[in-house]
């Protein structure tokens, strides 16, 4: 099975490109489901067909759904939310305010990703096309499972043991709500679901991200930052789609300057993202809405390509042995050395780029070694691990 995620700055046409990809895949005989995690819910507008939160067939081999984020929030967060509301009520917070405060902003969008795992597990489809929210929201979505994974593995077991130990005493001393096993089980269940999604989306044999851009300076700049942060968290970009290019046959002098500007920006995209394939779509003379026009756009974008293929293979993170040392290499395109912060604590390596931080749990082979040096060469952060001089080798599993 393949999973394709489409994202880009708001207004670039990512929903249209995602829908066109799904239509083209279905026409080739691949059982295709396209789903939207974007709160704007433009997918139904793109097909010009009303959609629900359940997959519905639009054409042979083509299904679509527009996720009800509130519904997913209630099914994933209900037990935890009830506890948080009870705690806030005990603390004197008004009931309505407690209800509002019990939901972390963005959780509804995050839970919509759990549908990805559900559809993969079902085995009903050959391709899952995900129309993601604009880039900032998508990055938050894709970075949360890893952050939660760190919390569950490092902090959660300690909290659970402490609460279990002191709960009998606290219930005698205070009326404050105390988390019970049901709440902890809900947190663990949520973690399993989100971590399962993370493993699927970082599987290089299954999942790819496709960035959609317009040939505009600010849009391209945001796409570069997005590519950097996706690489930081291990997500692979296999294509960039440049949408709404003014075609050569437009000869009106009003568009002459625009065509020159677009040509310059298109060259920038090709130079910046190489060797990632650059796909293009012209600015059509109408709205590309409905199955027939989306099929036309799919032909425009992919040409002779199979839309479901892995169009480019990248390796954001790799560990290789070099002599007696090991080199951990993390690809960080469009990054300056001064923007990167790296430090190690016990068996973890922390890498920060801009406002995003990733905690890498080192494999056991590297846990036994010391960091000797770090360098930034040709868009890769290279960190060399080796034993201290005179330190005997220790056995263990990788």
Regions found by a protein language model. Give the residues of each.
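Nucleotide-state-sensitive switch-loop elements of NTP-binding domains
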Residues: 1-12, 16-195
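Hydrophobic residues embedded in beta-strands of well-ordered beta-sheets
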Residues: 62, 326-328, 347-349, 381
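Charge-patterned, long linear interaction tracts outside catalytic cores
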Residues: 109, 113-115, 330-334, 343-346, ...
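C-terminal lobe/tail of nucleotide-utilizing enzymes
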Residues: 194-337, 350, 355-357, 361, ...
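Generic beta-strand structural signal
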Residues: 321, 344-345, 376
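Beta-rich strand-turn-strand
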Residues: 338, 367-390
């Amino acid at each position: 099975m393949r999973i394709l995620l489409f994202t880009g700055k708001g207004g670039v046409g990512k929903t249209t490109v995602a829908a066109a990809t799904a239509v083209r895949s279905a026409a080739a005989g691949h059982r295709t489901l396209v789903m939207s995690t974007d709160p704007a819910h433009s997918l139904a507008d793109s097909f010009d067909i009303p959609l629900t939160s359940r997959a519905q067939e639009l054409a042979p081999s083509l299904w679509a759904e527009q996720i009800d984020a509130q519904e997913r929030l209630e099914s994933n967060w209900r037990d935890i939310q009830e506890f948080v509301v009870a705690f806030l009520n005990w603390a004197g917070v008004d009931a309505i305010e407690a209800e509002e405060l019990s939901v972390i902003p963005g959780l509804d969008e995050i839970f919509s990703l759990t549908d990805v795992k559900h559809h993969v597990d079902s085995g009903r489809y050959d391709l899952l096309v995900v129309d993601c929210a604009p880039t900032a929201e998508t990055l938050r979505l894709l970075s949360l499972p890893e952050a939660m994974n760190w919390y569950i593995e490092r902090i959660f077991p300690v909290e659970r043991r402490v609460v279990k130990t002191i709960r009998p005493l606290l219930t005698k001393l205070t009326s404050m709500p105390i988390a019970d096993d049901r709440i902890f089980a809900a947190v663990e269940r949520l973690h399993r679901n989100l971590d399962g999604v993370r493993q699927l989306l970082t599987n290089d044999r299954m999942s790819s991200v496709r960035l959609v851009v317009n040939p505009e300076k600010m849009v391209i700049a945001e796409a570069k930052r997005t590519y950097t942060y996706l690489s930081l968290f291990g997500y692979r970009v296999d294509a960039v789609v440049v949408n709404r290019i003014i075609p050569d046959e437009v000869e009106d002098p009003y568009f002459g300057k625009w065509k020159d500007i677009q040509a310059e920006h298109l060259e920038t995209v090709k130079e910046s993202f190489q060797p990632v394939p650059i796909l293009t779509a012209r600015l059509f003379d109408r709205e590309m809405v409905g199955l027939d026009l989306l099929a036309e756009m799919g032909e425009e974008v992919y040409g002779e390509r199979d839309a479901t293929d892995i169009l480019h293979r990248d390796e954001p993170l790799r560990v290789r042995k070099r002599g007696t040392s090991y080199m951990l290499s993390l690809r960080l395109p469009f990054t300056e050395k001064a923007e990167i912060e790296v430090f190690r604590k016990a068996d973890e390596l922390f890498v920060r780029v801009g406002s995003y931080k990733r905690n890498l749990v080192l494999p056991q082979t590297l846990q036994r070694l010391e960091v000797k040096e770090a360098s930034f060469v040709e868009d890769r952060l290279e960190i060399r691990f080796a034993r201290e001089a005179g330190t005997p080798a220790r056995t263990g599993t990788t």
